[in-house]
């Protein structure tokens, strides 16, 4: 198959096992690497389940596997749970955000003194892309290291009903959330012995579980991807990881940047471009990005650039709208 232009619209990449999960466990039925394929039968007979991660993926797994007498332990670096959506829409917040990560953090803290934090974060989300584009590489790294956990739990929220169910599980002891880092796992017959280091401590704690579920979410390090197409692109130099390793490096038009220059006719869209645009997973953001890319590809075809000389004269906005 030949094409004048190719757009990589792969969405979120499948999760990879976190450090601490050894090969023996990875190949065992006592471990679920991809929770999006998790079925209730996988947990049949399990009383104690370790969930690696504490975000929305963990919540989905815990609620779907919840049974009388079953206990869950959720382990994540910071032990933070997603916050909940409001039952009624809050008063909108409209003030602009500007500056580096520290400046924006101060502005958010000040804004939440007079407005519902949800409204503040909703407005911040719409400002995230231009803010990210204006930050230096050092500022982006600082955000990822220090502020991303807070961003994630406020940005990716629970429905009010799910929040009630999770807090009920916490209150009843069905669910325990721990802050720490998984250090090792050992298969022991029909159970798994796991060791983790609590946050701020050196000595590990051990526990025994009947099932371990990877709930760390979509793959966040492009070099770890087992997607054959991604591996081939990187191997042949058609593309390269972005400086933060979040996805593939692209220019402002979404073209992949190879070993030394943009690759004409090869584009990426969505989470693969997170290193360049950061907030690029919600439908409104994807729709806007798709429209921009469609217009660019159509214009390149009209002018004979990027090897796309014979593109049909279709309105790119109609393509994005599905008309």
Model segments located where?
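Flavin (primarily FAD) cofactor-binding/catalytic cores of flavoenzymes
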Residues: 1-99, 106-302, 316-323
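Short, highly charged C-terminal tails/helix-capping segments
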Residues: 311-312
